[in-house]
């Protein structure tokens, strides 16, 4: 079963993921995109480490982390809504507080999407492979 991958795109902006991907080196970008493709095909019970992490703290329990590494640790915070995945806050993890900052950004993005569902748009990930 293919699930839809959506990304957060506020009006008049390209969105954080579309700004983030070109900053990565080619190998890491390709690995991250392969994980996104895998995410579209994965069963929810297979969202396990090392490539995926579910946050268990109540404040963040609707959020997950897609993880990939090369020379640096690339992460994308995402959520599941109506069976689809919404990719929210991408970041390079350099220190533990980077994750907390991305989680807080993701909660704000989710609030935006609740108020304006059109902020979650289908990702055309095929364009990046």
Please report, for each region that a protein language model flagged, where it lies by residue:
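Short, surface-exposed beta-strand/loop micro-motifs that present aromatic residues
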Residues: 75-79
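Basic, Lys/Arg-enriched alpha-helical interface segments
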Residues: 1-72, 82-85, 92-129
